Amino acid sequence: LRLVGSEMCIRDRIQLEIGVQSTNGATIREIHRTMQLERLKEVVKEVQKHENIHEHLDLIAGLPFEDYDTFAKSFDEIYELRPNQLQLGFLKVLKGSYMYEHAKEYEIEYHSRPPYEVLKTKWLPYEDVLKIRQVEEMLEVYYNSGQFEITMKVLGVLFKSAFFMFQELGKYYERNGYFGMSHARIRRSEILLEFIKETFAGDITAGEQRNITETGKKADHLEILDIIKESLIFDLYYRENCKSRPAWAKDLSVWKQVTRAYCKNGKQSHVECFSYRFPDKGERVLKELPKRAGKPLYALFDYTDRDPLDHQAKVTWIMEDEDAGLCSH
């Protein structure tokens, strides 16, 4: 990358995988690794500026000197970089490896069959390993899938800790018996909306007080729900022209004239009406919640012009202009 300059790389030809494993200094020293965390962050941000390289960063649960809280801190530090994929794995204790040789010292228990993944350590009890596995599943479904990109950006304004958010979402799945079931994409959206409603509509718990931002505490919960409903609709059409629509979706016939005027590619395009304008692709982190527009906004999703990196449709915003009528931006 240094030789050719990442801006010269052809889009979607390179995938960069960075094995972070942990940001906990004691852990990094114990596994005999050297890492300059701030330098790592600089490199990742430099790569991201050009938006042409798919970057994967990984973390490993079950390493020495890593307990639940320090792992959560590692998770949040790496999540803040918003890589294309944040891969959360579990320590594998392979025969002859350093971890195998020190398993007794670290009080590591692990599966006796492949892939020999950790069950507990001196620092991480079995119960915490199970909780991290729930976080991993929620991360895969709602972040790594790329199917909820805009909604994840909005939730980043509401939650201080992404780890806490995925942890609480996992608890919500467990309470309602949602784990172990096959859920369609729209059902995943419904569950996420249910979770947000439960979190922000009632009294905020002590844990939520610590992990929810001031914006999340002060914002009207109905406004939050309106934004999330629209961001979930945006996410659905960002990837595909959905045949089915969630129950809260607006009636398509309301803007059928706009659809006729702008949808020139049949099923390869779609127009949706929004009250909020959502961030452009290059804006990985939102600083504030989207603001309600004074007039209806229309997003034109063009599936003939997809981003080769994430396969999302090209989006053109269409706004009402007093003099010119509808105009695209």
Where are each of the predicted segments found?
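Single conserved hydrophobic/aromatic residue that forms the stacking wall/gate
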Residues: 1-5, 10
